[in-house]
């Protein structure tokens, strides 16, 4: 057969509705908005082609390989209900297209070039199915939820954290002082803000030293294990590892990384270092909204969350749900399950397009953070359950009497909610009552309740997705 030059429709090669997916395929669900006049089959096939073996014209070297073995295939297309000219296109990629143990390569292939494609008006990656054959090539989360609880000796309740504010401008000594006050009051963790790296007003080494001092003092005082997420994110991988090494030398339990701005290559390196040296790793998702905010273009956060579980991290920020709509609650809980559980069934009502089997890759603790305070505690306890970290920045430091009383208020509220739940009370319905009862015994909690007046907890049933 002679080589036939020229441009031919993608759908002739890459749209294969009869294809039966293999267990080893990486499956992707894209939300495709084609340009006017482009049929959905052609758009879906174009996505499959450009993110695998295809290019815009037939090339002579196609004859030197087996396209059937290596091409991505668009095997199903369904219109999105309620949206005109939007389709979910399912694409199957053969496993051989990806380098083992590299999230970087996986994303370069699947979302690398194709998002700037002219035939598409918009494109969003909604979900990925990672086959066990691929996930087994990753180290994954460094320790997992059970190991973390054993390291910290904390069981049967969510963990409490607090981001130190003002995020920029404090000197190292004052920063350490704020950390000490929070930990002494009853928090498990305090946190560097994601943009605290090593700035002129507070260099990283000074901060690490003063925070370590705060950790050891508060541990001695309370008899509990304490931690501070020391942000090791830096301008180069070498500098990042240097900071992690220093944290290990100080004997602290946990460091932190901004995994999207730092990049997956750096994150995976840090995760490997931290597992080898017994450090927990807290992951912040700064920049995620640049990628996942738009409904019709970009990448859904559940994909970024799965990628993090492959790359490695022990905690990751996952939104709060509270005060938002029911639909968001279901979707958030969908990717929280993808982070924590071993086996997650396909469930379109929660935005889960594929059944995901993690084959005993350790889980990641979801972190609820952002605009939450003591009145939210019952809802947070009910929604996230024990395996989570609840982080109150302003909700601790904004307490009228200071940081330590703010920490006390949060800890008392949490313990009250956990106890009430264990006694069989309904936190969603009786939440305010539980907090009010607890505040009778805790002046710190009473003061916090007064500052952030009641928030209602009715969850109206909203339409999902």
Swiss-Prot record:
Substrate binds at residues 113, 163, 167, 285, 317, 369. It comes from Ailanthus altissima (Tree-of-heaven). This is Ribulose bisphosphate carboxylase large chain. PANTHER family: RIBULOSE BISPHOSPHATE CARBOXYLASE, RIBULOSE BISPHOSPHATE CARBOXYLASE LARGE CHAIN. HAMAP family: RuBisCO_L_type1. Heterohexadecamer of 8 large chains and 8 small chains; disulfide-linked. The disulfide link is formed within the large subunit homodimers. Mg(2+) binds at residues 191, 193-194. The basic functional RuBisCO is composed of a large chain homodimer in a 'head-to-tail' conformation. In form I RuBisCO this homodimer is arranged in a barrel-like tetramer with the small subunits forming a tetrameric 'cap' on each end of the 'barrel'.
């Amino acid at each position: 057969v002679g080589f036939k030059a020229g441009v031919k429709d993608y759908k002739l090669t890459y749209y294969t509705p009869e294809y039966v997916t293999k267990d080893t395929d990486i499956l992707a669900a894209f939300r495709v908005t084609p340009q006017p006049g482009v049929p959905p089959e052609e758009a879906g096939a174009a996505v499959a082609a450009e993110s695998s073996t295809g290019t815009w014209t037939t090339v002579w070297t196609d004859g030197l390989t087996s396209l059937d073995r290596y091409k991505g295939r668009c095997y199903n297309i369904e219109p999105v209900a309620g949206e005109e000219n939007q389709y979910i296109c399912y694409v199957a990629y053969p496993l051989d297209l990806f380098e083992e143990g590299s999230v970087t390569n996986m994303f370069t292939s699947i979302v690398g070039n194709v998002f700037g494609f002219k035939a598409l008006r918009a494109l969003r990656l909604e979900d990925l199915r990672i086959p066990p054959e691929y996930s087994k090539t990753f180290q994954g989360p460094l320790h997992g939820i059970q190991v973390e609880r054993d390291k910290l000796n904390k069981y049967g309740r969510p963990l409490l954290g607090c981001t130190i504010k003002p995020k920029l401008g404090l000197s190292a000594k004052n920063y350490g002082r704020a950390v000490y006050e929070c930990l002494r009051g009853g928090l498990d963790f305090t946190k560097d803000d994601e943009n605290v790296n090593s700035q002129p007003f507070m260099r990283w080494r000074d901060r690490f030293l003063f925070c370590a001092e705060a950790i050891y003092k508060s541990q001695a005082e309370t008899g509990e294990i304490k931690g501070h997420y020391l942000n090791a994110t830096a301008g180069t991988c070498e500098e990042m590892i240097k900071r992690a090494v220093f944290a290990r030398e100080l004997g602290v339990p946990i460091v932190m990384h901004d995994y999207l701005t730092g990049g997956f290559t750096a994150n995976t390196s840090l995760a490997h270092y931290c597992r080898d040296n017994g450090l927990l790793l807290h992951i912040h998702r700064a920049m995620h909204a640049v990628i996942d905010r738009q409904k019709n273009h970009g990448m859904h956060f559940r994909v970024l969350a799965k990628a993090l579980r492959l790359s490695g991290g022990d905690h990751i920020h996952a939104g709060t749900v509270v005060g938002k709509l029911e639909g968001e609650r279901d979707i958030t809980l969908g990717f929280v399950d993808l982070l924590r559980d071993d086996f997650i069934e396909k469930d379109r009502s929660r935005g889960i397009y594929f059944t995901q089997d993690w084959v005993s890759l350790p889980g990641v603790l979801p972190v609820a953070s952002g605009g939450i305070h003591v009145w939210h505690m019952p809802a947070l306890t009910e929604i996230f359950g024990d395996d989570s970290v609840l982080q109150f920045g302003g909700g601790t430091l904004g307490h009228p009497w200071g940081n330590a009383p703010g920490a006390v208020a949060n800890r008392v509220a949490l313990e009250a909610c956990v106890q009430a739940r264990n006694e069989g009370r309904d936190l969603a319905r009786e939440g305010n009552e539980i907090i009010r009862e607890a505040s009778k015994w805790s002046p710190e909690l009473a003061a916090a309740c007064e500052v952030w007046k009641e928030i209602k907890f009715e969850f109206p049933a909203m339409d999902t997705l």
